[in-house]
């Protein structure tokens, strides 16, 4: 019996999708998982026969009765994913479905796909969901899989020697401003530094600097010099589900914490309570409140918080959340 894990290729190097799947693969390889590479492509170019042959090639290293962690979705469409699931089940492969995103819940226009995704989730022997809220929502939609694990936090593996964060009353935001209209109008006194090539500041914005996209190594080093990491909602964007942000977990949270700095998140974020309870950051319901949190912080409080985060960031750096998930998932395969 061998262990396998799918890993996506073919998207832009700065894609969160690619970065997340590649990070899981890197961590899983330390536990003996073998990579099953899947290339992102336009499935419309395949006839049913060609897709079938493509999947046979992808599955060539998998034997009857093996264990596969399927990082979901592949972004090749549910037809591709569903056929792969069916072929794996024909080979009596034990499937651990590691959900990164639930496509029918991301955008209102995709909700019609819910039955197709539930079909795959319900075929899974073990399901890994992002949060307790997502677990509850999927069960309301018709999820019947009994063995369900909750991820809770993304890891962010790296081999860098980071700085010790200095106390700075400034905010960082790593992400496209196009998806966060509120931040394009930033007008608080606290400086906001944005690392993105997408989106522009409005004419009324102040204390806002857009510094361009940075590679992961550059970003972590810059963040680790000190300040606060900001995570914000996308509720103003047409077509995006208002609830999705409350169900999924944020990669940005892990990036900031891995760099060793406190985070400020919306209270609606699925991990908000955990962040506050663990002393890793703060909740805020408005950008004015975000500014007030930073403005009222003092050196002693900041150092106490970053000392706490230093211990937690080691877990993310070394991939312990993912390692525990994968070990627990395999354990649950063997027990009733």
Swiss-Prot record:
One of its GO terms (molecular function) is UDP-glucosyltransferase activity. Pathway: Protein modification; protein glycosylation. The keyword Membrane does not apply. Gene3D superfamilies: Glycogen Phosphorylase B. Belongs to the Gtf3 glucosyltransferase family. NCBIfam families: PRK09814.1-1. Encoded in RD10, a pathogenicity island with an atypical GC content that is associated with invasive pneumococcal disease. Pathogenicity islands account for greater than half the genomic diversity observed between isolates. The main function of this island seems to be correct synthesis and export of pneumococcal serine-rich repeat protein PsrP. This is Glucosyltransferase 3. The lineage of its organism: Bacteria, Bacillati, Bacillota, Bacilli, Lactobacillales. The gene is gtf3.
């Amino acid at each position: 019996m061998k262990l396998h894990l799918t890993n996506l290729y073919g998207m832009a190097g700065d894609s969160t999708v690619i970065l997340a799947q590649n990070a899981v693969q890197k961590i899983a390889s330390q536990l003996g998982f073998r990579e099953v590479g899947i290339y992102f492509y336009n499935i419309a170019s395949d006839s049913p026969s060609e897709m079938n042959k493509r999947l046979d090639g992808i599955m060539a290293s998998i034997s009857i009765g093996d264990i596969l962690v399927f990082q979901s979705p592949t972004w090749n469409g549910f037809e591709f994913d569903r056929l792969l699931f069916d072929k794996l089940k024909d080979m009596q492969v034990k499937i651990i479905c590691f959900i990164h995103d639930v496509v029918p819940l991301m955008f209102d226009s995709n909700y019609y796909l819910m039955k197709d995704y539930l079909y795959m989730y319900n075929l899974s022997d073990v399901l890994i969901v992002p949060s307790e809220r997502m677990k509850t929502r999927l069960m309301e939609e018709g999820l019947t899989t009994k063995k369900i694990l909750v991820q809770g936090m993304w890891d962010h593996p790296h081999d860098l020697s980071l700085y010790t964060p200095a106390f700075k009353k400034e905010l960082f935001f790593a992400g496209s401003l196009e998806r966060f209209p509120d931040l394009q109008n930033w007008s608080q006194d606290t400086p906001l530094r944005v690392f993105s090539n997408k989106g522009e500041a409005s004419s009324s914005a102040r204390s806002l600097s857009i510094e361009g996209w940075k590679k992961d190594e550059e970003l972590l080093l810059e963040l680790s010099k000190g300040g606060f990491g900001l995570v914000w909602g996308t509720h103003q964007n047409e077509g995006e589900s208002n609830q999705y942000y409350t169900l999924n977990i944020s990669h940005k949270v892990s990036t900031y914490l891995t760099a060793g700095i406190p985070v400020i998140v919306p209270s609606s974020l699925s991990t908000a309570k955990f962040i506050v309870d663990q002393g890793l950051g703060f909740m805020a319901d408005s950008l004015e409140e975000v500014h007030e949190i930073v403005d009222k912080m003092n050196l002693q409080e900041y150092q106490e918080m970053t000392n706490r985060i230093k211990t937690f960031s080691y877990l993310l750096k070394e991939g312990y959340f993912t390692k525990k998930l994968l070990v627990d998932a395999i354990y649950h395969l063997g027990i009733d």
